[in-house]
Amino acid sequence: MADIFDSFELLYDRPGEPMINTKGEDKVLFELTEQFLTPEYANNGLELNNRFGDEEEVSRKIILKNLDKIPEFPKAKQLPNDADFSLFLPSHQEMANEVIDVLMSVTENQLQELLSTCVYARINLNPQLFNYCYTVAIMHRRDTGKVRVQNYAEIFPAKFLDSQVFTQAREAAAVIPKTIPRTPIIIPRDYTATDLEEEHRLAYWREDLGINLHHWHWHLVYPFSASDEKIVAKDRRGELFFYMHQQIIARYNCERLCNSLKRVKKFSDWREPIPEAYYPKLDSLTSARGWPPRQAGMRWQDLKRPVDGLNVTIDDMERYRRNIEEAIATGNVILPDKSTKKLDIDMLGNMMEASVLSPNRDLYGSIHNNMHSFSAYMHDPEHRYLESFGVIADEATTMRDPFFYRVHAWVDDIFQSFKEAPHNVRPYSRSQLENPGVQVTSVAVESAGGQQNVLNTFWMQSDVNLSKGLDFSDRGPVYARFTHLNHRPFRYVIKANNTASARRTTVRIFIAPKTDERNLPWALSDQRKMFIEMDRFVVPLSAGENTITRQSTESSLTIPFEQTFRDLSIQGSDPRRSELAAFNYCGCGWPQHMLVPKGTVGGVAYQLFVMLSNYELDKIEQPDGRELSCVEASMFCGLKDKKYPDARPMGYPFDRPSNSATNIEDFSAMSNMGLQDIVIKLSDVTEPNPRNPPA
């Protein structure tokens, strides 16, 4: 049975090459029949497929089951193979729904039938559309849990790499035999702009491979578009949309302060010119065109693009905004039958990122998704010039654009206005915050050979194998070498006294800058939005004194380093292989190498906040007793087929204003909380990743 799961994984290989070719480094051939051939290969496809099969190097042949009923895909086939795909476009959403429906409808455990259906879809559909729908189906079917989702950056490297790289990569693949180690292609750190553009100071963060993979993978686990409501309607999905993006904005603002920039300015006047320009320096290998740039001073314009299913005006958007603001002000939403329902944070999230879960899409619109579309089509709002969308409309590239953060700063402000309205959310009472009998006596961070309460960051170069995405080039690994931020591993040391009997407690760890842009102490009303959650975990407390230690690499926020920079094809004997197989669901976690903000060479003052909360108020009764498929990254990603593993509101205790404390010192005075000044210090050196393949 293992072979069939390997066969499914081969459908990710070289998405632009036809299926008549061999797949994978081992040259595996799918034996096609006439029903799988597209019109351009109708005359000679079987002959070519057989010719590949006669090659001595073919290691294995996969015989496909003929389908009794061939899927039609009337909508999805309308997307040309060389077009780019975006979930923000209504017409593309309909196409994706159609394909996902077909792949999900194959009878469970009929894996040969499913494989043939997927091969047919792979051959007949746009490669980006297929990859998205295929991955969503693989993640959500119960019989494909052993199929490993492949690293998107390895399959579509053009979404992550300077376009100049691919000429060098193909030359290396063609000239240097795969048996000889190939010198990695160096990706310069400053390839999209210079520091004359102040926003470019954040390019290392916005264009980080792991951060962009996180965003792409999160939206695979939590798709907003699917006909089957079960795929969308996961536990607390709307609230998680709020919290994950709120933490992205908080982390981005932390990085801005480290780079002497103000916090990001929300985009609230939708008719003003946009000063932020962005030139992505990316080419789409699917469409063989460059991604459209955005010049400084451009504005939103009414969208009239029938080909994309877009017909929406700025007036429409402003009306939707007023309706959402009214729902927040009254605490109620109006349903399609004119009745009302009490608004909560989960419902608001499903209104902002409109999906089948939106309570009234006609009234509240699709604001978040349309904000991406308006921002992506400023250069061609009427399809007059046949231009495609900008990077902000692709889940894998959207976080590269500085304007993404202005859009999401406004989105977060809407959620914060809900949290700050007492008729919607009441401030926490003392009993909701305290943990009777538990006293935190000290908190600290320690790293091997380093100063106590100092976190150390540095630059690292890591390699990614591009060969799976280099269509029509010779086989063998071709590596691109990225420079990215990293930090020295550290651990938290928390000392606590428990005057009651043995019990469990949830440890919640946050950090935030100690001062604002003007180097002044924060008001809690502002600093609470700057706290970034570093870890959350449950531990037993024995009676009396306790010392809790936790390694930074154990964080429930992050995915291991290997899941961002990994090549599954060489992991066969790796003892981590069982962990890597869990990438399908947990892969949407925050990248471990970006856990700590950059800091500065001189050191930036931060505050470490630790809370030991009352586990009796935290715990969740899961619907069944099945073992978890993975434990990492549950903070942003939840748990597969289970409830979110924390009963508290996401972001607790900083998700809402305090009715008594005005600063963090006052707020953290409760016995079950601890506060410690720490420093984040950057060592401005670049080190090679010891995991890189030998050159």
From Swiss-Prot:
Any one GO biological process: melanin biosynthetic process from tyrosine
Catalytic reaction annotation: 2 L-dopa + O2 = 2 L-dopaquinone + 2 H2O; L-tyrosine + O2 = L-dopaquinone + H2O
Uppermost EC category: oxidoreductase
Summary of activators and inhibitors of this protein: Activated by immulectin and lipopolysaccharide.
Tissue: Synthesized by oenocytoids, a type of hemocyte, and released into the hemolymph plasma.
Main localization category: secreted
SS bonds (residue pairs): C586-C630, C588-C637
Binding site for Cu cation A: H215, H219, H245
Gene3D superfamilies: Di-copper center containing domain from catechol oxidase (1.10.1280.10), Hemocyanin, C-terminal domain (2.60.40.1520), Hemocyanin, N-terminal domain (1.20.1370.10)
Names of the cofactor(s): Cu(2+)
PTM remark: The N-terminus is blocked.
Entry's localization field: Secreted
Alphabetic keyword roster: Copper, Disulfide bond, Melanin biosynthesis, Metal-binding, Monooxygenase, Oxidoreductase, Secreted
UniProt-listed Pfam families: Hemocyanin_C, Hemocyanin_M, Hemocyanin_N
Binding sites annotated in the UniProt record for Cu cation B: H368, H372, H408
Cofactor note: Binds 2 copper ions per subunit.
Keyword Disulfide bond: yes
Role: This is a copper-containing oxidase that functions in the formation of pigments such as melanins and other polyphenolic compounds. Catalyzes the rate-limiting conversions of tyrosine to DOPA, DOPA to DOPA-quinone and possibly 5,6 dihydroxyindole to indole-5'6 quinone. Binds to the surface of hemocytes and is involved in hemocyte melanization.
Protein name per the record: Phenoloxidase subunit 2
